[in-house]
């Protein structure tokens, strides 16, 4: 992130999407140089090697101090281990028919059975929560991506029915097509939990 922020400052822009192709090429070279400095070897050019490196990094993270403290605090046995899901990348930042968002199947404040969340067009997931741009309410997704929104509503109903609990979800729309990235039981107020 620091290298990206430095490049944006150097170019006098505030958003990643304002960087040119040449800026991104320059950034890629900077990332490769930083990788070599920290790891001691060149960044692998083979995609399979890159993927396996990422998978191994997740498994190694199981033993980092923060993870150990978290497991102790939440009484999670070390023997459970961790898993790695590998899935195709969905790009929410390829144009105006793309986007990303986070949403709950219900209001986390009141428990009302109504979608609650935010989304951004032409953005990646972290952009929604980073505060770089102002997200739109999830209700406006119906206007921007009507087919994807209809499918999203169906998926939300299916997930809540399956898990018997309010869901907190992350999603991406790429070229008008919906991709569900993650779901988990949502946190809410005690009053909302009663609904």
Regions found by a protein language model. Give the residues of each.
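Nucleotide/phosphate-binding sheet-loop regions of phosphoryl- and nucleotidyl-transfer enzymes
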Residues: 1-195
């Amino acid at each position: 992130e620091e290298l990206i922020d430095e490049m944006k400052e150097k170019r006098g822009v505030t958003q990643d999407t304002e960087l040119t192709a040449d800026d991104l090429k320059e950034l890629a070279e900077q990332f490769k140089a930083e990788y070599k400095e920290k790891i001691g070897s060149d960044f692998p050019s083979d995609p399979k090697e890159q993927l396996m490196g990422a998978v191994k990094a997740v498994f190694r993270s199981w033993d980092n101090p923060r993870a150990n403290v978290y497991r102790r605090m939440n009484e999670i046995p070390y023997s459970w281990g961790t898993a790695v899901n590998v899935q195709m990348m969905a790009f929410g930042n390829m144009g105006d028919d793309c986007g990303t968002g986070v949403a709950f199947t219900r209001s986390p404040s009141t428990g009302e059975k109504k979608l609650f969340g935010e989304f951004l067009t032409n953005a990646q997931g972290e952009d929604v929560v980073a505060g770089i741009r102002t997200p739109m309410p999830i209700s406006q997704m119906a206007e921007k991506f009507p087919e994807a929104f209809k499918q999203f509503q169906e998926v939300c109903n299916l997930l809540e029915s399956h898990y018997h609990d309010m869901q907190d979800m992350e999603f991406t729309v790429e070229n008008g097509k919906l991709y569900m990235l993650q779901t988990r039981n949502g946190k809410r107020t005690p009053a909302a939990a009663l609904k």
